């Protein structure tokens, strides 16, 4: 029997606010356990939450970026459940009146296909704390540093039908929140994590099957493997004549299986009701318009613009959009340098990216400023240095040198453009290699590169290769 897989995703993106959603405690990652915990985070009686305005602004930014509806009235509600790292006994979230509804995100699939993923809602809620199972041998510790950190929960409709579609959507969303500057996207630190709701149904059927939820996946590779395992598990159960149980499961990467965690709750189990300590949020159109006018450049628009640059291919564009810092670095160089787009991107994704990877650096803190890199590429564009000399200069720039003209003067890297001197070198090479000259004239034109190489060798890389090329063709006939 053939089956269709149906997937809906819930992504929790930690917002990059300096303080928590309802308290002034810091959101910085990696602090000593419980050192960034306020009375509100600890759930002590008599304390009242105060809403972080910046979190509201970030949620609106996201809603605009996904072409969603920004609701003028939004309400915080209490989601009631017990868990050791939730000291209040409830989570402040949004249910009936979220900030954002009815958005979409376009994703790219293979063979130049595009799919629109419908986003049902995006709402604000506070994160829970952490259970520390490895810190002590005889009991579990609780760290409330994360408790109260603002989350934007982004929920799709069940409109994804394969692991490939799910991963492409998640990567596109991950890219978007980073370019918006609302989330750092650090999956290892839990800043961007995903719950997968999955079911299967007979092929072509309009009736959805019983779903299971896979919780807190924080790696694209693990998400893909978890979906594949859960698809196969559902299929085995149904083809054995049994029924899938609606439950929450955890993925175990050590043995590539999912394990039951608890029965899957319905909304009624959480007994949502408006939080009496928080007033409804009224968002006026003028505020939304102001936020819209200040949105940064976003990946979809940048990609369309870059695709109008004939010299850039998909690989080049993907590199430029690999992070906001990479894009900003490329954009700054473009504004300062007359070099061709292809020249810029070849240096950035080639020798520069290799150096960054080798030294565990990124374009967030580049060893060469965009201004210096633009000046360097301008020298290449103006043919003041050859490509072989450029590599030597680049290595020096990576070690902290900044004055390119001083390097050229000190090392004697001035390019030789004297036509008569270069012509003399070409004549010497032709006399030195008569056998190769004969072969070239007989039709072995690839030998031209050999002659150019000899000229560059004799001039220690200082000759203008284009001039050498023209002179060789002139003398070889």
UniProtKB/Swiss-Prot annotation:
InterPro entries, alphabetized: Asn/Gln-tRNA_amidoTrfase_suB/E, Asn/Gln-tRNA_Trfase_suB/E_cat, Asn/Gln_amidotransferase, Asn/Gln_tRNA_amidoTrase-B-like, GatB, GatB_Yqey_C_2, Gln-tRNA_amidoTrfase_suB_CS, Gln_synth/guanido_kin_cat_dom
Enzymatic class: ligase
One BP term from GO: glutaminyl-tRNAGln biosynthesis via transamidation
Coiled-coil residues: none
EC number in record: 6.3.5.-
Annotated GO MF terms: asparaginyl-tRNA synthase (glutamine-hydrolyzing) activity; ATP binding; glutaminyl-tRNA synthase (glutamine-hydrolyzing) activity
Source superkingdom: Bacteria
Keyword terms, alphabetized: ATP-binding, Ligase, Nucleotide-binding, Protein biosynthesis
Catalysed reactions, semicolon-separated: L-glutamyl-tRNA(Gln) + L-glutamine + ATP + H2O = L-glutaminyl-tRNA(Gln) + L-glutamate + ADP + phosphate + H(+); L-aspartyl-tRNA(Asn) + L-glutamine + ATP + H2O = L-asparaginyl-tRNA(Asn) + L-glutamate + ADP + phosphate + 2 H(+)
Family: Belongs to the GatB/GatE family. GatB subfamily.
Function: Allows the formation of correctly charged Asn-tRNA(Asn) or Gln-tRNA(Gln) through the transamidation of misacylated Asp-tRNA(Asn) or Glu-tRNA(Gln) in organisms which lack either or both of asparaginyl-tRNA or glutaminyl-tRNA synthetases. The reaction takes place in the presence of glutamine and ATP through an activated phospho-Asp-tRNA(Asn) or phospho-Glu-tRNA(Gln).
Complex formation: Heterotrimer of A, B and C subunits.
HAMAP family named in the record: GatB (MF_00121)
NCBIfam families reported for this sequence: gatB, PRK05477.1-2, PRK05477.1-4
Protein name as annotated: Aspartyl/glutamyl-tRNA(Asn/Gln) amidotransferase subunit B
Encoding gene, per UniProt annotation: gatB
